[in-house]
């Protein structure tokens, strides 16, 4: 396809998409931390570097991802950072807002985190703090929206700490419902241990 058409360049959203493409056309690759985070010298790391060090530009979604890429061996001069964009705020559907209000009835204060369930996102610290917070705020709730490798560990921790009434997990929900949860919450919690400006 590339050979037979007037393609000026290729933009890929994953390094694997470029791994087998043999062309002298300009190539740009988008990166996220999860997909490039392989120990230096491993076969996966070598494959990543073979692709990323042979493209025109590497677009990292954050400074954290850029620094991780450099640490993994990607040439710094090739990397630019473009943070993910956001959609304009839209008016929320009353039906979704009512559904969330029914789910959270009598729960207050309401904390929420929307992110992958990764170790570095640090959900467990919030969950552990709830053990003490529920003594002061018996109706407190922590809403976790997302999915990831740590999901089962977090659910196990919730059970061990007897916090099933205080922690709610949601995944594969619509944007409308997710935004309604955010709208009906009091505090958006970002407890990451990596990003310096976590709240």
Model-identified regions with their sequence ranges:
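Nucleotide-sugar donor phosphate/pyrophosphate-binding loop at the beta->alpha transition
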Residues: 24-28, 33-54, 92
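Carbohydrate-associated surface elements
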Residues: 64, 85
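Nucleotide-activated donor-binding/catalytic signature segment of Leloir-type glycosyltransferases, i.e.
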Residues: 108, 144-145, 152-173, 187
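A short beta-strand/loop micro-motif in the catalytic core of glycosyltransferases
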Residues: 10-11, 54-63
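Acidic donor-binding loop of glycosyltransferase active sites
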Residues: 183-199
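Short His-centered aromatic/hydrophobic patch
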Residues: 12-17
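Short donor-sugar binding/catalytic loops of nucleotide-sugar-dependent glycosyltransferases
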Residues: 114-118, 133, 148, 173, ...
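Conserved donor-binding/catalytic core segment of Leloir-type glycosyltransferases
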Residues: 103-121, 127-130, 143
């Amino acid at each position: 396809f590339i050979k037979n058409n007037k393609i000026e360049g290729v933009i890929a959203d994953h390094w694997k998409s470029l791994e087998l493409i043999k062309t002298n056309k300009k190539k740009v690759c988008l990166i996220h931390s999860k997909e490039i985070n392989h120990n230096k010298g491993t076969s996966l790391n070598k494959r990543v570097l073979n692709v990323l060090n042979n493209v025109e530009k590497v677009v990292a979604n954050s400074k954290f991802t850029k620094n991780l890429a450099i640490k993994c061996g990607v040439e710094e001069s090739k990397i630019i950072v473009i943070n993910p964009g956001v959609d304009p705020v839209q008016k929320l559907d009353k039906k979704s807002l009512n559904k969330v209000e029914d789910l959270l009835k009598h729960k207050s204060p309401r904390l929420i985190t929307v992110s992958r369930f990764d170790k570095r996102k640090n959900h467990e610290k919030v969950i552990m703090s709830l053990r003490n917070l529920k003594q002061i705020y018996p109706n407190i709730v922590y809403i976790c929206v997302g999915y990831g490798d740590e999901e089962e560990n977090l659910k196990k921790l919730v059970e061990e700490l007897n916090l099933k009434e205080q922690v709610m997990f949601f995944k594969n929900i619509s944007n409308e419902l997710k935004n309604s949860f955010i709208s009906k919450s009091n505090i958006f919690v970002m407890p990451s241990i990596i990003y310096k400006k976590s709240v």
